[in-house]
């Protein structure tokens, strides 16, 4: 259903900047060039999927922040995709006058280090077998995994035979791949994907080359695990990351220093930002309520796990985390 959600944040103007294609975000450390002392630490980012080279633009914008970390999603719509970027219209020092409704490109709001944030990623997929090392590749095509033809590995991991065409193709269509760089972990000891994993679709198979094509350029040395969407895993993983966030900000077991600060003079109490002020949840338009068991079921899980905090979000055509789409 069409909807509008609004979160009002009590953040001083010197600690954030709204940016867009007509009011770009200055690289961290270059704020003085335009008379501002603002240094972006992280950013909430919206992007148009139709923009050429959008993954590269996301990575480049992340490099403009001191942390190199951005979060958000691709704008999605039943019809025309637009982005709203409303600055201070010249009435707030350092905020600029560029405001409007935009098509294409990137927009969002950057925050400095004084605006404390915690971010987590949930994939909602389970690996069907161990992670493999890509040992031969050509663009989007995985030619070999662990020095075996990639198609042979796919058949073994999914327990299928492509000669049995219809059941095999149905299972391949329900399968995705989780990708990581060589130095990043792929699967945790508990069996879930690590936060660094990027989940991508399988876009084709090449029996002639015994290869598998995926929706991302791959390189030799990267790690790949075949995976499938799993409703129970998605619910458990969503609950887990919310619990991690709550524990990071409101630990059940306090350290001696924190306990002492809470009982001491209010001037040395923990910074208010350590208490959860609000949350933004970016979900995948490809799964939504039905995947979690009913309308709004996904948001109800987040609400229960985080507690009674202001909560907004949106369904994205693709999620943005770290420097990745």
Predicted feature descriptions by range:
Residues 58, 295-299:
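Amphipathic alpha-helical segments in well-structured domains
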